[in-house]
A protein has these predicted regions:
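Short beta-strand edge/turn micro-motifs at domain boundaries
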Residues: 14-27, 135-156
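A mature extracytoplasmic/lumenal domain signature
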Residues: 68, 78-79, 102, 107, ...
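Short solvent-exposed beta->alpha transition segments
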Residues: 46, 65-102
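Bacterial N-terminal signal peptides
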Residues: 1-8
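Short, low-complexity N-terminal intrinsically disordered segments enriched in polar/charged residues
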Residues: 13-70
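Short hydrophobic/aromatic-rich beta-strand segments that constitute the beta-sheet cores
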Residues: 74-75, 117, 151-153
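Hydrophobic pocket/interface hotspot
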Residues: 52, 64, 72, 87, ...
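Surface-exposed, charged secondary-structure patches
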Residues: 14, 88-130
């Protein structure tokens, strides 16, 4: 597969019907990665992570539900923990508003049906009234279920 790198972060998977066209994510930027060095599995996991970030910026809870497992829990920078539905409710009602998300220096690892995507999130957001740009490094876990990468809790 031939990949073309545009604007430092946009991958167009030529010959695959633009399957991984990161430029469709208008509120998500990738920095510090050469996607042409990723294999198909790594690229698909990174694409799913970027797709989730775009859904966050659009408050597209239906897409978020497609990507996130039902038993997922979220831990905020403050330490507050929420179930998937509690978190999605806050996104839907605007308590959490994401304007743009940068994915800096992502590292993708795939082992069978499990994948990790580790990166520094640069979130421009209004989180419960605290507006600004927030930087957080984290690892996101995905499990391949029926051919799709689904965000899951950290495996124990």
């Amino acid at each position: 597969m031939l990949l073309t790198l545009l604007l430092g972060a946009t991958a167009l998977a030529e010959g695959t019907d633009m399957k991984y066209d990161f430029s469709t994510f208008t509120n998500v930027t990738l920095k510090g990665i050469d996607v042409s060095k990723l294999n198909e599995e790594e690229l698909s996991a990174l694409y799913q992570a970027a797709r989730y970030c775009q859904a966050m910026t659009e408050a597209d809870v239906e897409t978020m539900r497609q990507i996130v497992s039902e038993d997922m829990t979220f831990t905020h920078m403050s330490g507050m923990k929420q179930t998937r539905e509690e978190y999605f409710a806050d996104v839907a009602d605007g308590s959490l508003t994401y304007y743009a998300i940068g994915m800096e220096n992502p590292v993708v690892a795939v082992d069978g049906d499990m994948a990790t995507v580790t990166y520094t999130s640069v979130l421009t957001a209004n989180a419960y009234g605290a507006q600004g740009t927030f930087r957080m490094k984290g690892t996101h876990y995905y499990q391949r279920i029926n051919g799709e990468w689904i965000a899951v809790n950290r495996p124990e």
